[in-house]
């Protein structure tokens, strides 16, 4: 069964630039695991493992929500979730995502699918296993275009164990 989440994808050039910027922080914390550019995204809601049929139903139900997605958003603040040891890029105005997040969550619930009930925090995960107590860091601010929500599946390579995300169509 696929393990899925609803997300907003970023343009490839933005992902490449963010990954490059994040790698510059490797000298601060060489043990951190940095997110590959192809895996950068903005999670709107985590669903978990569902059937392939339900994944297709949810993917189709997300398509009409494009109209609720802001045209663009600014990436540029660095933050950490210390408990989870996550380094992230913050977004502003984060509240502009509330309508699409609320509707995505409502759609998931209406379809009778599981939904992670953690509160939404607008961020893009740049690294995991990030240590504590590092000096403040900055990213160049970028205003990036957004498209509508899509359903993504987590795929683990059986040979390498590496995770990648692919869109459920």
Located regions from the model:
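Histidine-dependent nucleotide/RNA phosphoesterase domain, centered on the 2H-phosphoesterase fold
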Residues: 1-169
């Amino acid at each position: 069964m696929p393990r899925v989440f609803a997300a907003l994808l970023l343009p490839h050039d933005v992902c490449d630039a963010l990954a490059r910027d994040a790698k510059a922080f490797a000298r601060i914390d060489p043990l951190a695991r940095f997110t590959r550019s192809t895996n950068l995204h903005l999670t709107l809601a985590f669903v978990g493992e569902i059937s392939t049929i339900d994944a297709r139903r949810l993917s189709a139900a997300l398509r009409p929500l494009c109209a609720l997605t802001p045209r663009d958003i600014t990436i540029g603040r660095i933050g950490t979730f210390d408990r989870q040891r996550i380094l992230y890029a913050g977004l502003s105005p984060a509240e502009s995502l509330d309508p699409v997040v609320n509707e995505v969550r409502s759609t998931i619930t209406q379809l009778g699918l599981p939904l992670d009930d953690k509160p939404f925090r607008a961020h893009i995960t740049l690294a995991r296993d990030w240590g504590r107590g590092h000096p403040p860091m900055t990213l160049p601010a970028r205003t990036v275009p957004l498209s509508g929500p899509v359903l993504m599946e987590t795929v683990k390579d059986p040979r390498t164990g590496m995770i990648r995300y692919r869109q459920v169509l």
